[in-house]
């Protein structure tokens, strides 16, 4: 071997050693990445399972509160069958209705109290009535109640609204 080849061989050995080290690090990083990916998949699966369990628990909590209302209704129906009197049944149903509303209010459900004027954020106009007797977009009639769950509207109030009469050709009359 001549003098020029020795540094080249040393340099090749160093390069090979560095390459081997990089390959080893690459395999370690790929293995670590594979483990992280598996851990993340497990986390997603566990999170989904936990969310489902929380939902089941919330539903169970709410439904257990409704069981006494069902029991009261069964007793009311039995009372009507037994006594053939609807007077007691009606007063019993009123009590049950109030009890149910108390449970629903405690859970955050409230009936929307409609205003006199149409509000597109709380109302759904399902009927329009042409009239000069009321201000335009006044609510003439509540067709179905609306509800809020906490502050979110879950069902708008369905209403009948007043609109100005239109002329024969479809244009508004002045």
Swiss-Prot record:
This is Protein GrpE. Homodimer. GO terms for biological process: protein folding. It comes from Pseudothermotoga lettingae (strain ATCC BAA-301 / DSM 14385 / NBRC 107922 / TMO) (Thermotoga lettingae). InterPro entries: GrpE (IPR000740), GrpE_coiled_coil (IPR013805), GrpE_head (IPR009012). The keyword Transport does not apply. One of its GO terms (cellular component) is cytoplasm. Keywords: Chaperone, Cytoplasm, Stress response. Participates actively in the response to hyperosmotic and heat shock by preventing the aggregation of stress-denatured proteins, in association with DnaK and GrpE. It is the nucleotide exchange factor for DnaK and may function as a thermosensor. Unfolded proteins bind initially to DnaJ; upon interaction with the DnaJ-bound protein, DnaK hydrolyzes its bound ATP, resulting in the formation of a stable complex. GrpE releases ADP from DnaK; ATP binding to DnaK triggers the release of the substrate protein, thus completing the reaction cycle. GO terms for molecular function: adenyl-nucleotide exchange factor activity; protein homodimerization activity; protein-folding chaperone binding; unfolded protein binding.
